[in-house]
């Protein structure tokens, strides 16, 4: 598989996970899901910041696990296919930890899944329709398997 160039910034607004979800680990996960060169910021936030962002940008007044913000050309159109993917991916540590516990998964496994999920969103993948969801889930399963993780959609 081709290694795509990555410029990665990691921000720990919520520092509780910085010793577990380290920059080298995050870089490995992001690169596993890259289909093109990218400039990506991963930001770990608490529930309060996650809720504010979800409310302000999606109109949903609760913290969610991952939000992906992509950048468009000045005219509002999508970035050209051959351009560098640019995105901010926000991960809410409170939701990550809660979901991992509820799903009997390690924080590492669940975080890897959601980082890959966010990177796929940054590259234009979505799950609004069943067909889109199946395509996105298949890629998530493939990329996670390449990293040594099991299928995240099979209940433990």
From Swiss-Prot:
Binds 1 zinc ion. Transmembrane segments: none annotated. Its EC number is 3.1.-.-. It is an enzyme of class 3 (hydrolase). Its cofactor is Zn(2+). It is found in: Cytoplasm. GO terms for cellular component: cytoplasm. Zn(2+) binds at residues 117, 121, 127. One of its GO terms (biological process) is rRNA processing. One of its GO terms (molecular function) is metalloendopeptidase activity. Keywords: Cytoplasm, Endonuclease, Hydrolase, Metal-binding, Nuclease, Ribosome biogenesis, rRNA processing, Zinc. Belongs to the endoribonuclease YbeY family. Single strand-specific metallo-endoribonuclease involved in late-stage 70S ribosome quality control and in maturation of the 3' terminus of the 16S rRNA. This is Endoribonuclease YbeY. The lineage of its organism: Bacteria, Pseudomonadati, Pseudomonadota, Betaproteobacteria, Burkholderiales. The gene is ybeY.
């Amino acid at each position: 598989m081709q290694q795509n160039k990555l410029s990665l910034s990691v921000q720990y607004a919520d520092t509780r996970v910085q010793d577990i979800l380290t920059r080298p680990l995050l870089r490995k996960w992001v690169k596993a899901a890259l289909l093109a060169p990218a400039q990506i910021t991963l930001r770990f936030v608490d529930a309060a910041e996650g809720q504010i962002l979800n409310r302000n940008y999606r109109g949903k007044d609760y913290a969610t696990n991952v939000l992906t913000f992509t950048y468009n050309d000045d005219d509002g159109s999508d970035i050209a296919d051959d351009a560098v993917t640019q995105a901010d991916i926000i991960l809410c540590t409170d939701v990550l930890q809660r979901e991992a516990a509820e799903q009997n998964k390690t924080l590492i496994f669940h975080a890897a899944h959601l980082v890959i999920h966010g990177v796929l969103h940054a590259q234009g993948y979505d799950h609004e329709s069943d067909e889109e969801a199946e395509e996105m889930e298949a890629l998530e399963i493939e990329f996670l398997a390449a990293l040594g993780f099991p299928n995240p959609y099979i209940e433990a």
